[in-house]
Structures are given as C-alpha cells and as structure tokens.
Curated annotation (Swiss-Prot):
The chain crosses the membrane at residues 55-75, 89-109, 124-144, 150-170, 177-197, 198-218, 239-259, 277-297, 305-325, 328-348. Its main location: membrane. It is found in: Membrane. InterPro entries: Sugar_P_trans_dom, TPT_transporter. It comes from Arabidopsis thaliana. Residues 19-51 are annotated as: Disordered. This is Probable sugar phosphate/phosphate translocator At3g10290. The keyword DNA-binding does not apply. Belongs to the TPT transporter family. TPT (TC 2.A.7.9) subfamily. Keywords: Membrane, Sugar transport, Transmembrane, Transmembrane helix, Transport. Residues 22-32 have a biased composition (Polar residues). It is a multi-pass membrane protein. GO terms for cellular component: membrane.
Length: 355
C-alpha cells in the first residue's frame, strides 16, 4: 500500500479519536459544575434559613419577655395577698438587689452590653434622682397589689400615656396635636368606668396604683430631660446597673422603719412553707429578667411593634390573673378596661401619624 493511501486511512482514525475525546471533556466540565452546585445550594439554603432563625429568635425573646413580666406580676400578687408576705417595700428591695447583682454580672463579666461609665458628679446625681422616682413607682405598684386585683391594677397602669403626655407638657412645654390629646379621653374614661364596675375596689390601693403609674410616667419624662445630652445618655441596662444599688441603699432604712418585723415574719414563713425562699429568689430574678428582655425586645423590634406587644401583654396578664386568682369581674369592668386599651392604641397611632 502506498504512503498516500495510508495517509487517507489515518485521517479518519485521527478524526474519530478526536471526536471521542470531546464528550469526555464535556463530561468532566459537567462534573465540575455539579460539584460546585451543592455549595451554591447550601449557600442559598443558609441565606433562606437566616430569616427563619431571626424570626425564631425574636419570637423566643417575646415569649420570655411576656413570661417574665407577667410572672413577676402574678408572683408579687401571690406573695403579697395570698401567701401572708405583706412587705411590699422589702420585696422591692429584693428586686433591686437582684437587679444590682445580675446587672453587674451581665455587663462587667458576660459583656452582654458595653459598659458605660458615669463621667461626672452631676450625671451621678441625675441617675440618683431617677433611681428614687423609680423606687417610688415600684413600691407604689407593689403596695397596690396588696389591695387590688391584678386585672384592675393593669387597667389603671394602662393610663401611663395620659400621665406621660401631661408631664411632658408641664415640664418641657411639648405639645402634641389636638387629635392626639383627644385619643387620651377614652383612656381616662375607661378607667373611671372600670373603677365603678370593680367589685374589689379599694381606695388606698387605687391611690397607690395611680401614684405608681404617675411616677412611672414622670420618671420617663425626667429621664429624657436629665440624660438628654449625648455624653450623658445611658442605655436601659447601664442605667439599671447604676440605679439598682442606689435604690437598695434608699430602701433599706425605709424597710427598717416601716416594716420592722419583716425578718422575723420571713423566717417564720420560711419554716412553714419550704418553697418560700425559692419563690422570693425566682421572683427577684424574674424582676431583673423582665428588664433585660425588655431591653432586648426593644433592640430587635420596632417602636410600633413594641407598643402593640405592650398593649397585648396587659390584656394577657388580665386574662391569666382572672383565671388564676378567680377574682370576680363585671361586664362594666371589662368594658372599661377595653375602652382604656383601645384609647391607648388610638393614642399611639395618632402620635405616630401626627409626629
């Protein structure tokens, strides 16, 4: 066979072998692409799961916030009214002691939030003033629980926006739109109706409850005035860190003077009821966790969401307290509380729109 004929035979063989290699290249490239795809899919799945994790985290925070807030309220009522532990000032001092210790551990050791330092004597005096007002509001609220059912206590407490608007106008001359003030009318009207329909109404308890509500509103307005400058502003956890020890020091002499037999009665109750000290400890820890979770919920949600959650929390506390303590309620009382809550919702909405 000639060399020319051999060349003709070799050409198709070479072309055939070249054609066979092409599919191999395409298969290997497809394999590489397939190897990359699982990573891309995992990235997409992780990015899609992160919003779910965030939602789960916020939902858990809200549930814990509700549990701690409502839990400390119901435990306060149980201890002060049903358990024979009639020492609201000492109970408040226990709460403040727990807040002082746990705030220090959370901020200094666990570093849950950055530590902010008091920079001047003037700033310290401002924080001390806020601490005294805060003490008065908590003590007043605890005293009122001795005489009033939780449901009515919450109805009166819902009038906080009314007192906040009042003190803001008196102390800072800050005016809201007239429609905003108009929304406060049902807030007050509802409490008046609820008071008339409350079977367990007690004048001293009512005065202490309304005073505690006013003090709470006064403290929020005063805080905005005293710690208004950027250099003196503290977040709520650092403010609690500095306010709590001052509150304990202020409450100690008041407890000794107004509740002199607190230690003997507490020791007696501790011998009679084996869970007495555990209840006091859990109650005090819950008081701190309510503040911590309130800070975290505020940080991770919007102001509007927080307002809605706060209103719903009051309603949930009322329902649970009625089921637990079985205090009698009337249609008039429920109607009055409902009007108050609707007024608070309307006030928040008008304030947001006419800001």
């Amino acid at each position: 066979m000639s060399s020319h004929a051999r060349g003709k035979e070799l050409i198709p063989l070479l072309s055939f072998s070249h054609q066979k290699k092409q599919p191999n290249l395409s298969i290997s490239s497809t394999t590489k692409m397939n190897k990359k795809n699982p990573d891309q899919k995992s990235d997409m799945s992780s990015s899609s799961s992160s919003p779910k994790k965030q939602t789960l985290f916020i939902s858990s925070l809200i549930i814990l916030w509700y549990t701690s807030n409502i839990g400390v309220l119901l435990l306060n009522k149980f201890l002060l009214s049903n358990y024979g532990f009639k020492f609201p000032i000492f109970l408040t001092m226990c709460h403040m002691s727990a807040c002082a210790i746990l705030s220090y551990v959370s901020i200094v050791f666990l570093k849950l939030v950055p530590l902010q330092y008091l920079k001047s004597r003037s700033q310290f005096l401002k924080v001390a003033t806020l601490s005294i007002v805060f003490c008065a509001s908590v003590v007043g609220g605890n005293i009122s629980l001795r005489y009033l059912p939780v449901s009515f206590n919450q109805a009166v407490g819902a009038t906080t926006p009314f007192f906040t608007a009042l003190f803001a106008y008196i102390m800072t001359f800050k005016r809201e739109a007239w429609v905003t003030y108009g929304a406060l009318v049902p807030v007050v009207t509802g409490v008046v109706i609820a008071s008339g329909g409350e079977p367990g109404f007690h004048w001293f308890g009512f005065i202490m409850c309304i005073s505690a509500t006013a003090a709470r509103a006064f403290k929020s307005v005063l805080q905005g005035i005293l710690l208004s400058s950027e250099g003196e502003r503290l977040n709520s956890m650092n403010l609690m860190l500095y306010m709590s020890p001052i509150a304990v020091i202020a409450l100690l002499p008041v407890t000794i003077f107004m509740e002199p037999d607190v230690m003997s009665v507490t020791l007696t109750l501790g011998r009679q009821h084996k869970y007495m000290y555990i209840l006091l400890l859990v109650n005090s820890v819950m008081a701190y966790s309510a503040n911590l979770l309130n800070f975290l919920v505020t940080k991770h949600t919007s102001a509007l969401t927080l307002q809605v959650l706060g209103n719903a929390k009051g309603a949930v506390a009322v329902v649970i307290s009625i089921l637990l303590f079985r205090n009698p309620v009337t249609v008039m009382g429920i109607g009055g509380y409902s009007i108050t809550v609707l007024g608070v919702v309307a006030y928040g909405e008008t304030k947001r729109r006419f800001r």
